Amino acid sequence: MRLTPKELDKLMLHYAGALAKSRKERGIKLNYVESIALISMEIMELAREGNKSVAELMQQGREILKADEVMEGVASMVNEVQVEVSFPDGTKLVTIHNPIEDNGKLTPGEYILKDEDITLNANKESISIKVTHKGDRPIQVGSHFHFFEVNALLEFDRAQAFGKRLDIASGTSVRFEPGEEKNVNLIDFGGKQKIIGFNDLTNAHINKENKEQCLANAAQKHFIH
């Protein structure tokens, strides 16, 4: 007997489905792969009988497994199952949407958010400073960039900005267009109060002792102040 690769795939799927069915009958909750295999196998067998339409198979496909017969989270992971099956009049694709009724439990990786506003950077004192862009190209500053060390062509009171960052949501930024003047709010950095990198003006703990040296570094590198 010679089998084509497609026929071998169907046999493997049938074997996996039969194994899943055996486990289900023994009361074992099925995982993601087992659930897909069982639904696919049952649809192939029902189609092989030759007395059901595609619409009927789509409906029956939703009745093969219940949420309490699979592992937690599996029901919501299986959004659809597609099976290419043989009918008396040819091969057709049967698509079953949401084949396992969800049980209302949490989805793996799901975010559950409170139905209320979230205060950003709560309990942190914020200051406002005026910034003027003296360059000829746009400059974008990220939320956690040490504002004291931003682009040398941004003019503002750098002494006030020492040890501070933008008072905006993490991962967002503020854009400065050439010639633009705007006020921004700054808050203190958290954590261990040690700043490394950026434009190499600090590379030290944020304190009064280091501030004067950092200001001197900025002046030496021609950062507008």
Curated annotation (Swiss-Prot):
Q: Which GO terms describe its biological process?
A: cellular response to iron ion; urea catabolic process
Record key words, sorted:
Cytoplasm, Hydrolase
Q: Does the keyword Lyase apply?
A: no
- What EC number(s) does the entry state? 3.5.1.5
Region: Urease gamma; residue ranges are 1-102
Region forming the signal peptide: none
Subunit structure and binding partners: Heterohexamer of 3 UreA (alpha) and 3 UreB (beta) subunits.
Q: What is this protein called?
A: Urease subunit alpha
What organism, scientifically named, is this protein from? Helicobacter hepaticus (strain ATCC 51449 / 3B1)
Taxonomic placement: Bacteria, Pseudomonadati, Campylobacterota, Epsilonproteobacteria, Campylobacterales
